[in-house]
């Protein structure tokens, strides 16, 4: 009996240690904690299942200890509900959970990113010298795409993205060979139809914006490690319009 009590104490001690680690992790980086919450829960219950399995393998199955096992299980669930999920639970007994906190954090990050994108766009426009308007002339589509690409690079650098401008006709005639080779992206048929209708598409974290302002082009944005925002599509298209003012 004393051995059983000792094992229970050890189990509760381990639970307390894990709980303190979770608290430390939460206060150290709340945003990262919210992002990794589901992974933490899976790890938490995975450790519980493994520990119970190992215990049975070593000690054998003893149904007389069901009260102790029930208490241990209740403690594991309590830590999950009281700390990992709270206050993001909308329904417990129906096994339906609404991770409100994660959603709020996601919206908050999107709003902050959108505001930052707006400030970047405004800064680029303000730094353009109006005296340059109406002074440029592009004799070929290649010259135009290079000029537009150089203008859009400043926006791409500031948001940590890669922007490349392609001639639309050339890409359509080669089954998007240029885009596929540079971005390792396969464009589904339905997206090609949308591009033909002058509608922007997004394949994973790569956005493609059709623009027919001076010349028919596809503007490709690779967000890399940063998620693309809807504001990015709007800003890049508006910058393309702004770039057209340079034309004679």
Swiss-Prot record:
- Where does it primarily localize? membrane
Q: Does the keyword Transcription apply?
A: no
Q: Which residues form a coiled coil?
A: none
**Which top-level group of life is the source organism from?**
Bacteria
Q: Does the keyword Ligase apply?
A: no
Where do the TM regions start and end?
5-25, 46-66, 69-89
Q: Name one Pfam family in it.
A: SpoIISA_toxin
Membrane topology, as annotated = Multi-pass membrane protein
Q: Which GO terms describe its cellular component?
A: plasma membrane
Q: Which GO terms describe its biological process?
A: sporulation resulting in formation of a cellular spore
What UniProt keywords apply to this chain's record, in alphabetical order? Cell membrane, Membrane, Sporulation, Toxin-antitoxin system, Transmembrane, Transmembrane helix
Where does the record say this protein resides? Cell membrane
- Report the function annotation for this chain: Toxic component of a type II toxin-antitoxin (TA) system. Upon expression in E.coli growth ceases.
Q: How does it assemble?
A: Probably forms a complex with SpoIISB in which SpoIISB neutralizes the toxic activity.
The similarity comment for this entry is:
Belongs to the SpoIISA toxin family.
- Protein name per UniProt: Stage II sporulation protein SA
Gene that specifies this protein:
spoIISA
